[in-house]
């Protein structure tokens, strides 16, 4: 019997903002086959499909610490500042975040508008 069998997916992670879906093999802070790694938040994790190394993994996402919706770690969907926050919650509570985060969010706004405009233009 082969003891190096791939872990079976536990379920499917789906970002409630962008719709990203991927099978995850673990949810928590200490992924299997990792010796000294502890993630700072409960996360949806999958084995890294790009390497045979069992200790390598990808963090797909987590739950927003305010609204509890599942969000991916993509910069368009969430940010981590002591905890995971979805961008809608960050924007709703922007004044509660440090100035550095507020400035970072201001920088993100023009980019997202450009992306939206490009998507609309590509349809016509």
Curated annotation (Swiss-Prot):
InterPro entries: CDPF1, CDPF1_dom. It holds the Pfam family C6_DPF. Residues 105-124 are annotated as: Disordered. Residues 115-124 have a biased composition (Basic residues). Belongs to the CDPF1 family. PANTHER family: CYSTEINE-RICH DPF MOTIF DOMAIN-CONTAINING PROTEIN 1, CYSTEINE-RICH PDF MOTIF DOMAIN-CONTAINING PROTEIN 1. This is Cysteine-rich DPF motif domain-containing protein 1. It comes from Gallus gallus (Chicken).
